[in-house]
Amino acid sequence: MSYSLMSRKIKTVISFKIESRFEEWVKIFDSKEADLRHSEFDIKPLFRGFSKDDPKKIICIHQSPKGNIQKFFQANSEWIKSHKFDFSTMEESSEI
């Protein structure tokens, strides 16, 4: 496998539910601390919003090297849980 394919960034769509309101959650997502945590894993948030049918369902699109989203969640799971993120509702899909 060539290096260029291994280092290629992929787009990942993640959806999940939150217990708080979107306005509260987005303040955390847009914070400097979240930016630093994302940058540690070379994750670039491209979009964050909520479902028009369910304002507690969040949809995020990120760009990162393959596998980095999973590494981010493993390294930051307690921090993420503290922001009322329901891991049991998380769905993820990726494209290269």
Which sequence ranges carry the predicted segments?
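Short S/T/G/P-rich N-terminal loop/turn motif that feeds into the first structured element of a domain
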Residues: 1-96
